[in-house]
Every structure is written in C-alpha cells, then in structure tokens.
Amino acid sequence: EDQSFDTRLRGVLERIATLPVPTFAAISGACMGLGMQLALACDIRVATDDAYFGIPAGKLGLVVNHWTLQRLALNLGFGAARLMVLTAETFTSDDAWRLGFTQVQGDLDAALELARRSTDLAPLSLLGSKVGLNLVERALDEPEFNAAFERAWNSADLTEGRLAFAERRSPVFKG
C-alpha cells in the first residue's frame, strides 16, 4: 500500500458521499479505521448498542486523508475528533449518539426503514439538499497537510506500525 491506495480510497469515499440519493450506514460492532471512513461517507448512521468507533491510525504510524479528518471534525466536533485521532480513543455507541455522529440508535431494520421513508420524498429535493450539505463540508486540501501526509506515508514508522500489528506487539516509532 502507498499513497495510490489513499487516492483510490478517497475516490470511493467521495463517490459514496456524492451519490444522488441518501446513503445509510447500519453499524453493529466494530466501526474502526476504514469502517469509520465508510460510515463518514454516508448521510445517515444507525448504530446498535454494541457499536464502537475509532481511527487508530497513530497505532499504525499513518495519517488518514484530509477528507476523513475534515468530515470527522464536522461530524463529531473538533474536540472529539482530536481526541479520537490524536489519542486513538475508541468511542462507544452512546458516545457517538451524544456527539451526533449517529442519528439513530437501532439495528439494520431501523436503517432500512429510514431508507424506505426517504424513497417517498421528492428526488430532486433530496439531491439539492444533499449537494448543499456536502458543500458545507468541502474545502481545498492544504499544501502543509499534504506534505505531512506524504512524510508519514513514506516513513519507517508506517512500516514499523504495520509489522508490529502483524506480529501483535507494541510498535517502536522513531519519528
């Protein structure tokens, strides 16, 4: 994996986020890393009581893309996003609900019911609203962030983080 992985991933996440219809995430159990990124791409998130959320990128020596960090901050709040990313904190289902990251506490049936309800609404109204909401979240990538992102993805720390994860040991990062 390298930065081309992130480029492809970001393309997938942006495609999901900009689909012309509402998207719903039904979350049960772990919603970590890539799962969290997929949930961030969805419009509405429904979670069971046993769901938990996190982006443990620092444990692997990598940086998630700016798109993810931006959506995380806008959906969780800047303080909670910083706590999650900068300490690898895992949030419970109740935390996610309290912070507004999840909109409904329920199961797959609850998510399917919301999706069904949305099909009764005017498609162009939904599309216009979704485009407007997505514009609130749009910002240009900053060169400073891009440089930090490239340094992390090209670092020995990333290799060490992945190796330590595979070997089930604590990583030794050198920065």
Segments and roles (model prediction):
Residues 46-51, 93, 99-143, 156, ...:
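C-terminal long alpha-helix characteristic of the crotonase
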Residues 84-85, 129-132, 149, 165:
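Short alpha-helical scaffolding segments that buttress acidic/His motifs in well-ordered protein cores
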Residues 1-28, 68-70, 151:
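An acidic, glycine-rich surface segment that forms the CoA-thioester-binding/catalytic face
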Residues 163-175:
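Terminal low-complexity tails and localization/encapsulation signals of metabolic enzymes
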Residues 9, 69, 78-81, 111, ...:
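A general structural signal for well-ordered alpha-helical segments in protein cores
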Residues 6, 10, 33, 66, ...:
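Glycine-rich phosphate-binding loop at the start of an alpha helix
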Residues 12, 16-18, 32-85, 110-114:
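CoA-thioester-processing core
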